[in-house]
Amino acid sequence: MKTNRILIIVAAAVLLLTSCNNGHERMLTIINEDGTCSREMSFHPYPNSVMASSDEPIENDGLHFGADWQRSWSVVGDSVCHPIPLTQEQWDSLQRVFPKQTVRDKILMHTKRNFQNVSEMSDSLTSVVRHLFKATASLDKHFKWFYTDYVYQETLAITDIEQIFSVPLDRFVSADTASYWFTGQPNLADGLTGAEQKELLDEIEANISHWFNACTMAFVYTYASLRYDEVKNPPVSKEQYLALKDSIVMSPAVRNMDLFSDISQVSKIIKDFYHSDAYTPLFSDSKEWERVLDKKYKSYEYLMMMAPQLDYVMPGKVIDAGNGVVEGNVVRYRFSGERLIPHPYDVAITSRVTNVWAFIVTFLVIILAVGSFFYYRK
């Protein structure tokens, strides 16, 4: 069987081998004092996306945009945005300018939309991503006379994660270890030497790899049961076969698999477990299994490809950026899809707007009070 494209992508994402932000793709969120907001997403587009008319729905790496999103494009590093659609002539011209690179890597598509409130905005993001994903957001205003605090919170999460990973992650690593591997927090390597850090990471990587193998094996094993009536002289009944799934999934043989680069590995494990080759024909069509696995992991592939920098602009001055970093008037959050695996991803930002009018009113009240005091003393 040829190495499955989706499995390579998924494996790389899970093992954090390719989970770096290219620095160009981002999601800019602007919160206004009146509660209205806007969101702009910038990403490298495929030709059919950037060449589509503004009233035509588009899909780009699993992101879905309708006609209610304003669209434009720009060359990477250039602040000038151009209207869509980009023409074939423009695409060819850009290819001549960048002969050794793909045009897609040298341009960005920008999609922007305004919202009445942050709830509407988060619902829209859920619709854009769609695949096993949900966003929720809230904005609270706290009036304190001389100033008003704005507290913005947003949570990004994977929904129904068991659709992809049916075997619980906590059977392989602790909650803190999983969080450290996928998000970097808590820092379990704090105080360790370089050699000790490598030993720790090697152990975690082996356990995460085992978990992924187990989840994939569980899916393949269960999916094969749908064709159980094709098995000639099975060593056990279908009910017994399914009941023994956990024993297969958690076996040492699964731990050492090469992430299903060859479906015959699955067949061999099952054959060795049951001491029978009755199930071997179920795995004879490698191309069919490639299609099955491709479909299984497509939604997850899209999630793992998400790695935009999250930028937030709040009203007034930011006084608490949470886990973000303040750069000028922008709060930046580092984000990538695999960070959603152990737990939801939280954004929490508090900003403060000075109420100038409150100072003026207070000053006038003081002046009136002092004036009244001296007036009545006369």
Where are these regions (language model features)?
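Juxtamembrane interface at the cytosolic side of transmembrane helices
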Residues: 367-378
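C-terminal motif of bacterial Sec signal peptides marking the signal peptidase cleavage site
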Residues: 16-19
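Glycine-rich loops and low-complexity Gly/Arg-rich segments
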Residues: 52-55, 64-66, 336, 357-360, ...
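Start-of-domain marker
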Residues: 21-93
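Bacterial N-terminal signal peptides that target proteins for export
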Residues: 1-7
